[in-house]
Amino acid sequence: MHDQSTARLHQDPFAPSRRQFVAAAAAAASAMTVALPASAQQAQPKIKLGVVGCGGRGAWIARLFKNHGAYDIHALADYFPDVANAAGDALGVDKSRRFSSLSGYKKLIESGVDAVALETPPYFFPEHARAAVDAGLHVYMAKPVAVDVPGCLAIEAAARKAATNKKCFLVDYQIPTDPFNIEALNRARDGGLGRLFVVHSHYFGGQFPDPPKTATIESRLRFLTWCNDVALGGGYHVNACIHSIHGGLLLVGKTPAAATGFSSIRRDNPHGDSHDAFSISFQFADGLVWNHLARHGNGLFAPEQVFSGCEFLADPAFLRIGYGGRTILRGGPKQYAGGDVQNLYEAGAVRNIATFHKNVTEAAADTTTVRLAIDSCLMTILAREACLRADKITWDQLLKENKTLSADLSGLKT
Protein backbone atom coordinates (compact mmCIF):
# COMPACT_ATOMS: atom_id res chain seq x y z
CA MET A 1 0.00 0.00 0.00
CA HIS A 2 2.83 2.38 0.82
CA ASP A 3 4.41 1.93 -2.61
CA GLN A 4 1.06 2.71 -4.22
CA SER A 5 0.63 5.78 -2.04
CA THR A 6 4.08 7.01 -3.04
CA ALA A 7 3.54 6.29 -6.70
CA ARG A 8 0.30 8.26 -6.85
CA LEU A 9 2.35 11.46 -6.51
CA HIS A 10 3.27 10.89 -10.14
CA GLN A 11 0.00 9.38 -11.35
CA ASP A 12 -2.80 11.50 -9.94
CA PRO A 13 -4.60 13.88 -12.29
CA PHE A 14 -4.14 16.55 -9.63
CA ALA A 15 -0.52 15.74 -8.70
CA PRO A 16 2.02 18.35 -9.87
CA SER A 17 4.39 17.12 -12.54
CA ARG A 18 7.75 18.86 -12.91
CA ARG A 19 6.43 20.86 -15.88
CA GLN A 20 3.36 21.90 -13.92
CA PHE A 21 5.47 22.89 -10.92
CA VAL A 22 7.66 25.13 -13.07
CA ALA A 23 4.59 26.68 -14.71
CA ALA A 24 2.92 27.22 -11.35
CA ALA A 25 6.12 28.66 -9.95
CA ALA A 26 6.37 31.12 -12.82
CA ALA A 27 2.78 32.18 -12.27
CA ALA A 28 3.37 32.63 -8.55
CA ALA A 29 6.54 34.62 -9.13
CA SER A 30 4.72 36.96 -11.49
CA ALA A 31 1.85 37.57 -9.05
CA MET A 32 3.72 40.09 -6.94
CA THR A 33 1.38 43.06 -6.61
CA VAL A 34 -1.30 43.38 -3.96
CA ALA A 35 -3.82 45.10 -6.21
CA LEU A 36 -4.36 45.35 -9.95
CA PRO A 37 -4.24 48.73 -11.70
CA ALA A 38 -7.68 50.23 -12.27
CA SER A 39 -7.52 49.50 -16.00
CA ALA A 40 -6.66 45.86 -15.36
CA GLN A 41 -9.44 45.55 -12.80
CA GLN A 42 -11.96 46.67 -15.42
CA ALA A 43 -10.54 44.28 -18.03
CA GLN A 44 -10.53 41.14 -15.90
CA PRO A 45 -13.72 39.18 -15.27
CA LYS A 46 -14.81 39.26 -11.65
CA ILE A 47 -15.26 36.11 -9.62
CA LYS A 48 -18.13 36.02 -7.14
CA LEU A 49 -16.50 34.74 -3.97
CA GLY A 50 -17.97 33.47 -0.73
CA VAL A 51 -15.76 33.36 2.37
CA VAL A 52 -16.55 30.72 5.01
CA GLY A 53 -14.89 31.61 8.30
CA CYS A 54 -14.54 35.35 8.88
CA GLY A 55 -12.45 35.53 12.04
CA GLY A 56 -8.85 36.72 12.14
CA ARG A 57 -7.34 35.12 9.05
CA GLY A 58 -10.68 34.81 7.27
CA ALA A 59 -11.41 38.54 7.44
CA TRP A 60 -7.78 39.31 6.62
CA ILE A 61 -7.66 37.12 3.52
CA ALA A 62 -11.07 38.37 2.39
CA ARG A 63 -9.53 41.85 2.29
CA LEU A 64 -6.67 40.49 0.16
CA PHE A 65 -9.20 39.00 -2.26
CA LYS A 66 -10.97 42.35 -2.44
CA ASN A 67 -7.69 44.24 -2.87
CA HIS A 68 -6.85 42.03 -5.83
CA GLY A 69 -9.54 43.93 -7.69
CA ALA A 70 -11.08 41.11 -9.69
CA TYR A 71 -13.08 39.41 -6.96
CA ASP A 72 -16.55 40.37 -5.80
CA ILE A 73 -16.90 39.40 -2.14
CA HIS A 74 -20.47 38.27 -2.63
CA ALA A 75 -21.28 36.38 0.58
CA LEU A 76 -19.87 35.59 4.01
CA ALA A 77 -20.50 32.83 6.55
CA ASP A 78 -19.27 32.44 10.09
CA TYR A 79 -20.62 30.53 13.05
CA PHE A 80 -20.81 33.79 15.02
CA PRO A 81 -23.25 36.43 13.66
CA ASP A 82 -21.20 39.31 15.07
CA VAL A 83 -18.10 38.06 13.25
CA ALA A 84 -19.96 37.72 9.94
CA ASN A 85 -21.50 41.17 10.36
CA ALA A 86 -18.21 42.84 11.27
CA ALA A 87 -16.57 41.38 8.18
CA GLY A 88 -19.61 42.24 6.07
CA ASP A 89 -19.52 45.86 7.19
CA ALA A 90 -15.81 46.11 6.43
CA LEU A 91 -16.12 44.47 3.02
CA GLY A 92 -19.42 45.99 1.90
CA VAL A 93 -21.32 42.71 1.70
CA ASP A 94 -25.10 43.02 1.66
CA LYS A 95 -26.70 41.99 4.96
CA SER A 96 -28.90 39.47 3.16
CA ARG A 97 -25.77 37.53 2.20
CA ARG A 98 -24.22 37.25 5.65
CA PHE A 99 -24.87 33.86 7.17
CA SER A 100 -24.19 32.31 10.55
CA SER A 101 -24.52 29.07 12.58
CA LEU A 102 -23.02 25.70 11.65
CA SER A 103 -25.13 25.51 8.49
CA GLY A 104 -24.36 29.02 7.28
CA TYR A 105 -21.99 27.66 4.65
CA LYS A 106 -24.92 25.94 2.94
CA LYS A 107 -26.75 29.23 2.42
CA LEU A 108 -23.53 30.82 1.18
CA ILE A 109 -23.12 28.07 -1.40
CA GLU A 110 -26.69 28.68 -2.56
CA SER A 111 -26.23 32.47 -2.76
CA GLY A 112 -24.87 32.57 -6.30
CA VAL A 113 -21.11 32.44 -5.73
CA ASP A 114 -18.65 31.06 -8.26
CA ALA A 115 -16.05 30.05 -5.70
CA VAL A 116 -15.53 29.66 -1.97
CA ALA A 117 -12.60 30.43 0.31
CA LEU A 118 -12.58 28.09 3.31
CA GLU A 119 -11.04 29.57 6.48
CA THR A 120 -12.75 27.75 9.35
CA PRO A 121 -11.18 25.38 11.88
CA PRO A 122 -9.90 22.44 9.78
CA TYR A 123 -12.34 19.96 11.32
CA PHE A 124 -15.02 21.45 9.05
CA PHE A 125 -12.99 21.56 5.82
CA PRO A 126 -13.93 18.14 4.39
CA GLU A 127 -17.67 18.76 4.82
CA HIS A 128 -17.48 22.29 3.42
CA ALA A 129 -15.21 21.37 0.50
CA ARG A 130 -17.37 18.42 -0.49
CA ALA A 131 -20.50 20.58 -0.47
CA ALA A 132 -18.83 23.29 -2.54
CA VAL A 133 -17.55 20.84 -5.14
CA ASP A 134 -20.92 19.08 -5.30
CA ALA A 135 -22.46 22.49 -6.05
CA GLY A 136 -20.04 23.03 -8.94
CA LEU A 137 -17.91 25.70 -7.26
CA HIS A 138 -14.19 26.39 -7.33
CA VAL A 139 -12.43 25.95 -3.97
CA TYR A 140 -9.67 27.95 -2.30
CA MET A 141 -8.82 26.61 1.13
CA ALA A 142 -6.42 27.08 4.00
CA LYS A 143 -4.25 24.35 5.47
CA PRO A 144 -4.27 21.77 6.94
CA VAL A 145 -6.87 20.15 4.73
CA ALA A 146 -8.16 17.93 7.56
CA VAL A 147 -7.46 16.67 11.08
CA ASP A 148 -7.64 12.91 10.44
CA VAL A 149 -7.16 10.29 7.73
CA PRO A 150 -10.85 10.09 6.68
CA GLY A 151 -10.86 13.87 6.29
CA CYS A 152 -7.79 13.75 4.07
CA LEU A 153 -9.40 11.07 1.92
CA ALA A 154 -12.57 13.17 1.68
CA ILE A 155 -10.55 16.14 0.43
CA GLU A 156 -8.81 13.84 -2.05
CA ALA A 157 -12.19 12.69 -3.38
CA ALA A 158 -13.53 16.25 -3.54
CA ALA A 159 -10.48 17.48 -5.44
CA ARG A 160 -10.68 14.57 -7.84
CA LYS A 161 -14.34 15.40 -8.52
CA ALA A 162 -13.42 19.07 -8.99
CA ALA A 163 -10.82 18.07 -11.57
CA THR A 164 -13.36 15.88 -13.36
CA ASN A 165 -15.81 18.79 -13.39
CA LYS A 166 -13.15 21.21 -14.69
CA LYS A 167 -13.10 23.24 -11.48
CA CYS A 168 -10.12 24.65 -9.60
CA PHE A 169 -9.10 23.53 -6.14
CA LEU A 170 -6.20 25.41 -4.52
CA VAL A 171 -4.70 24.83 -1.08
CA ASP A 172 -3.03 28.00 0.19
CA TYR A 173 0.59 27.19 1.10
CA GLN A 174 3.00 30.10 0.94
CA ILE A 175 6.53 28.59 0.93
CA PRO A 176 6.18 27.28 -2.67
CA THR A 177 5.34 30.77 -3.98
CA ASP A 178 8.48 32.62 -2.90
CA PRO A 179 10.85 33.40 -5.83
CA PHE A 180 14.00 32.45 -3.87
CA ASN A 181 12.47 29.16 -2.74
CA ILE A 182 11.27 28.45 -6.28
CA GLU A 183 14.69 29.01 -7.85
CA ALA A 184 16.56 27.04 -5.20
CA LEU A 185 14.17 24.09 -5.48
CA ASN A 186 14.37 24.11 -9.27
CA ARG A 187 18.18 24.02 -9.15
CA ALA A 188 18.12 21.22 -6.60
CA ARG A 189 15.75 19.19 -8.77
CA ASP A 190 17.96 19.76 -11.80
CA GLY A 191 20.88 17.93 -10.20
CA GLY A 192 22.17 20.76 -8.06
CA LEU A 193 21.87 18.98 -4.72
CA GLY A 194 23.35 15.54 -5.24
CA ARG A 195 22.54 12.48 -3.16
CA LEU A 196 20.23 13.47 -0.33
CA PHE A 197 21.21 12.05 3.08
CA VAL A 198 19.22 13.91 5.73
CA VAL A 199 16.30 16.35 5.89
CA HIS A 200 15.87 18.54 8.95
CA SER A 201 12.73 20.61 9.46
CA HIS A 202 11.65 22.72 12.39
CA TYR A 203 8.86 24.95 13.64
CA PHE A 204 9.39 27.35 16.55
CA GLY A 205 6.12 29.29 16.56
CA GLY A 206 4.04 30.68 19.38
CA GLN A 207 0.99 29.50 21.27
CA PHE A 208 -2.64 30.51 21.04
CA PRO A 209 -5.09 31.18 23.88
CA ASP A 210 -6.15 28.00 25.70
CA PRO A 211 -8.76 29.08 28.27
CA PRO A 212 -10.87 26.75 30.40
CA LYS A 213 -13.53 24.87 28.47
CA THR A 214 -17.19 25.83 28.73
CA ALA A 215 -20.45 23.88 28.49
CA THR A 216 -20.08 23.61 24.69
CA ILE A 217 -17.15 23.96 22.32
CA GLU A 218 -18.49 27.31 21.08
CA SER A 219 -15.77 29.14 23.00
CA ARG A 220 -13.11 27.04 21.23
CA LEU A 221 -14.21 28.16 17.75
CA ARG A 222 -12.64 31.64 17.82
CA PHE A 223 -9.35 33.42 18.51
CA LEU A 224 -7.46 30.33 17.25
CA THR A 225 -8.27 28.56 20.50
CA TRP A 226 -9.09 25.50 18.40
CA CYS A 227 -5.37 25.07 17.61
CA ASN A 228 -5.10 23.58 21.11
CA ASP A 229 -7.72 20.92 20.33
CA VAL A 230 -6.72 17.92 18.25
CA ALA A 231 -10.21 17.18 16.92
CA LEU A 232 -10.95 20.77 15.87
CA GLY A 233 -7.57 21.88 14.56
CA GLY A 234 -5.42 18.79 14.29
CA GLY A 235 -3.21 19.99 17.12
CA TYR A 236 -0.17 22.22 16.89
CA HIS A 237 1.87 19.76 14.87
CA VAL A 238 -0.75 19.19 12.18
CA ASN A 239 -1.89 22.79 12.09
CA ALA A 240 1.46 24.61 12.22
CA CYS A 241 4.43 22.27 11.72
CA ILE A 242 2.81 21.31 8.44
CA HIS A 243 4.35 24.41 6.83
CA SER A 244 7.83 22.94 7.28
CA ILE A 245 6.76 19.39 6.42
CA HIS A 246 5.08 20.59 3.23
CA GLY A 247 8.24 22.54 2.37
CA GLY A 248 10.31 19.38 2.70
CA LEU A 249 7.95 17.37 0.51
CA LEU A 250 8.34 19.95 -2.25
CA LEU A 251 11.77 18.42 -2.85
CA VAL A 252 11.55 14.92 -1.37
CA GLY A 253 8.38 14.16 -3.32
CA LYS A 254 7.51 10.94 -1.51
CA THR A 255 5.87 9.94 1.74
CA PRO A 256 7.66 8.17 4.61
CA ALA A 257 7.38 4.48 5.39
CA ALA A 258 7.12 5.12 9.13
CA ALA A 259 7.54 7.63 11.94
CA THR A 260 8.65 7.56 15.56
CA GLY A 261 8.78 10.38 18.05
CA PHE A 262 8.15 11.89 21.43
CA SER A 263 5.96 14.85 22.34
CA SER A 264 4.51 16.48 25.42
CA ILE A 265 2.47 19.42 26.72
CA ARG A 266 4.79 22.10 28.11
CA ARG A 267 2.55 25.18 28.16
CA ASP A 268 1.21 26.47 31.47
CA ASN A 269 -2.33 25.59 32.52
CA PRO A 270 -3.40 23.71 29.37
CA HIS A 271 -7.04 22.93 28.65
CA GLY A 272 -6.83 21.58 25.11
CA ASP A 273 -5.32 18.16 24.39
CA SER A 274 -2.73 19.17 21.79
CA HIS A 275 0.91 18.60 22.58
CA ASP A 276 3.25 21.54 21.92
CA ALA A 277 6.80 20.10 22.05
CA PHE A 278 7.88 17.53 19.44
CA SER A 279 10.90 15.52 18.35
CA ILE A 280 10.08 13.29 15.37
CA SER A 281 11.99 11.00 13.02
CA PHE A 282 10.62 9.86 9.67
CA GLN A 283 11.93 6.71 8.02
CA PHE A 284 11.86 6.32 4.23
CA ALA A 285 12.00 3.12 2.22
CA ASP A 286 15.20 4.21 0.46
CA GLY A 287 17.02 5.01 3.71
CA LEU A 288 16.47 8.76 3.74
CA VAL A 289 16.41 10.20 7.26
CA TRP A 290 14.14 13.16 8.13
CA ASN A 291 14.10 14.72 11.58
CA HIS A 292 11.65 17.36 12.77
CA LEU A 293 11.89 19.50 15.91
CA ALA A 294 9.16 21.82 17.17
CA ARG A 295 8.38 24.11 20.05
CA HIS A 296 5.03 25.87 20.12
CA GLY A 297 5.78 28.40 22.80
CA ASN A 298 6.38 32.12 23.12
CA GLY A 299 10.14 32.04 23.72
CA LEU A 300 13.03 33.02 21.48
CA PHE A 301 15.19 30.99 19.12
CA ALA A 302 18.61 31.53 17.55
CA PRO A 303 18.96 34.89 15.75
CA GLU A 304 20.04 33.24 12.50
CA GLN A 305 17.00 30.94 12.49
CA VAL A 306 13.52 31.48 11.14
CA PHE A 307 10.45 30.09 12.88
CA SER A 308 9.67 27.61 10.09
CA GLY A 309 12.18 26.08 7.73
CA CYS A 310 13.63 23.01 6.11
CA GLU A 311 17.24 22.01 5.42
CA PHE A 312 18.48 19.32 3.03
CA LEU A 313 21.94 17.85 3.67
CA ALA A 314 23.26 16.05 0.62
CA ASP A 315 26.52 15.09 -1.07
CA PRO A 316 27.84 17.50 -2.25
CA ALA A 317 25.40 20.35 -1.60
CA PHE A 318 23.25 21.91 1.12
CA LEU A 319 19.84 23.53 0.61
CA ARG A 320 17.80 25.67 2.95
CA ILE A 321 14.30 26.96 2.23
CA GLY A 322 11.77 28.42 4.59
CA TYR A 323 9.06 30.81 5.62
CA GLY A 324 11.64 33.53 6.13
CA GLY A 325 15.36 33.98 6.52
CA ARG A 326 17.85 33.21 3.79
CA THR A 327 17.20 30.63 1.12
CA ILE A 328 20.46 29.21 -0.22
CA LEU A 329 21.85 26.32 -2.26
CA ARG A 330 25.45 25.92 -1.13
CA GLY A 331 27.97 23.79 -3.00
CA GLY A 332 27.39 21.50 -5.94
CA PRO A 333 27.19 22.38 -9.63
CA LYS A 334 24.26 24.80 -9.37
CA GLN A 335 25.11 27.00 -6.38
CA TYR A 336 22.65 29.75 -5.62
CA ALA A 337 23.26 32.64 -3.26
CA GLY A 338 19.52 33.08 -2.91
CA GLY A 339 18.24 35.80 -0.63
CA ASP A 340 15.99 36.64 2.28
CA VAL A 341 12.37 35.51 2.09
CA GLN A 342 10.28 38.57 2.91
CA ASN A 343 6.73 39.02 4.23
CA LEU A 344 5.72 35.55 3.08
CA TYR A 345 2.54 35.32 5.16
CA GLU A 346 0.93 38.07 3.08
CA ALA A 347 2.96 37.89 -0.11
CA GLY A 348 2.35 34.16 -0.49
CA ALA A 349 -1.39 34.56 -0.02
CA VAL A 350 -1.45 37.41 -2.53
CA ARG A 351 0.32 35.24 -5.11
CA ASN A 352 -2.04 32.34 -4.50
CA ILE A 353 -5.06 34.61 -4.82
CA ALA A 354 -3.75 35.87 -8.17
CA THR A 355 -3.02 32.32 -9.33
CA PHE A 356 -6.50 31.17 -8.32
CA HIS A 357 -8.10 33.99 -10.30
CA LYS A 358 -5.99 33.19 -13.35
CA ASN A 359 -6.84 29.50 -13.18
CA VAL A 360 -10.56 30.09 -12.72
CA THR A 361 -10.93 32.71 -15.45
CA GLU A 362 -8.79 30.79 -17.92
CA ALA A 363 -10.68 27.55 -17.21
CA ALA A 364 -7.43 25.88 -16.22
CA ALA A 365 -9.22 23.52 -13.79
CA ASP A 366 -5.99 23.40 -11.79
CA THR A 367 -5.79 21.14 -8.73
CA THR A 368 -2.02 20.61 -8.59
CA THR A 369 -1.60 21.94 -5.04
CA VAL A 370 -3.82 19.21 -3.64
CA ARG A 371 -1.59 16.11 -3.73
CA LEU A 372 1.19 17.57 -1.57
CA ALA A 373 -1.38 19.24 0.68
CA ILE A 374 -2.93 15.85 1.40
CA ASP A 375 0.37 14.02 1.79
CA SER A 376 1.82 16.67 4.11
CA CYS A 377 -1.34 16.47 6.21
CA LEU A 378 -1.14 12.68 6.38
CA MET A 379 2.56 12.94 7.25
CA THR A 380 1.85 15.25 10.19
CA ILE A 381 -1.00 13.01 11.35
CA LEU A 382 1.39 10.04 11.18
CA ALA A 383 3.87 11.92 13.37
CA ARG A 384 1.21 13.10 15.80
CA GLU A 385 -0.05 9.56 16.30
CA ALA A 386 3.46 8.11 16.66
CA CYS A 387 4.22 10.66 19.36
CA LEU A 388 0.96 10.07 21.22
CA ARG A 389 1.60 6.32 21.26
CA ALA A 390 5.36 6.67 21.86
CA ASP A 391 5.79 3.99 19.24
CA LYS A 392 6.72 3.46 15.63
CA ILE A 393 3.78 3.69 13.23
CA THR A 394 3.96 2.83 9.56
CA TRP A 395 2.27 4.75 6.77
CA ASP A 396 0.34 1.63 5.79
CA GLN A 397 -0.82 1.16 9.38
CA LEU A 398 -2.07 4.74 9.59
CA LEU A 399 -4.11 4.41 6.40
CA LYS A 400 -5.47 1.01 7.39
CA GLU A 401 -6.60 2.26 10.80
CA ASN A 402 -8.41 5.17 9.10
CA LYS A 403 -9.08 6.69 12.53
CA THR A 404 -11.83 9.32 12.76
CA LEU A 405 -11.64 12.26 15.16
CA SER A 406 -15.01 13.56 16.34
CA ALA A 407 -15.70 16.95 17.87
CA ASP A 408 -18.68 17.32 20.20
CA LEU A 409 -20.95 19.80 18.42
CA SER A 410 -23.86 19.36 20.82
CA GLY A 411 -25.42 22.57 22.03
CA LEU A 412 -24.18 24.61 19.07
CA LYS A 413 -26.44 26.69 16.83
CA THR A 414 -27.24 24.66 13.78
Language-model-detected regions and their locations in the chain:
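C-terminal helical cap and adjacent loop that interface with cofactors, partners, or active-site loops
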Residues: 24-29, 60, 243-256, 270, ...
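N-terminal Rossmann-like dinucleotide-binding module
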Residues: 28-92
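A structured beta-alpha segment of the ubiquitous adenosine-cofactor-binding alpha/beta core
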Residues: 97-114, 118
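Predominantly a Rossmann-like dinucleotide-binding segment in NAD(P)-dependent oxidoreductases
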Residues: 53, 164-171, 175-272, 280-282, ...
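N-terminal glycine-rich "phosphate-gripper" loop used for MgATP/nucleotide binding
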Residues: 119-123
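N-terminal secretory signal peptides and thylakoid transit peptides that target proteins
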Residues: 4-28
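Beta-strand-loop-alpha-helix segment that lines the small-molecule cofactor/substrate pocket
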Residues: 114-115, 126-177, 390
